[in-house]
Amino acid sequence: LVGSEMCIRDRQRYVQERIIPQYVGFDKAHQIDHAEKVIEESLKLALHYEVDSAMVYTIAAYHDLGLCEGREFHHIVSGKILLADETLRQWFTDEQMLQMKEAIEDHRASNQDAPRSIYGKIVAEADRIIDPEITLRRTVQYGLSHYPEMDKEQQYERFRKHLADKYAEGGY
């Protein structure tokens, strides 16, 4: 049990010191607070299922790291980053690594297909964080960060369309 607890602490320390700080370089809607909130929400959701909480924690921590190469394929790049992280292999099997990679690839809300596993469903749901104030703030921050050339009216239209596309009936 002592070795197991050390293993958990080592893994969490690694994620906190080496993975989470990478979010500092992303847009205002995808900073450290976003990663921490997705981890928190993912772990809450995980309590309702028979899942490996270490995998849930790790998936949530890595889910947006691919933003380092842009938004369009960030979910694919994030999965590749996780799979390429040799440090994780001291805690996870090859099969677990593949499951986590797939869950990260599947987390994107705009994906046409449902996530392949419960792990993908958990992180996808946690990433949607339906706190209205946070959702609105992140949508505005994303627009200002990625479309600085837009005036107020254009920003508002982009904001309105995004919220309708994502959260209205039939939204992704």
What are the roles of these predicted feature ranges?
Residues 32, 36-39, 57, 94-105:
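Short, well-structured alpha-helical segments
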Residues 1-8:
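Short, small-residue-biased leader/transition segments that mark boundaries at the very start
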Residues 38-42, 73-88:
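An active-site-proximal "capping" alpha-helix that borders the catalytic cofactor pocket
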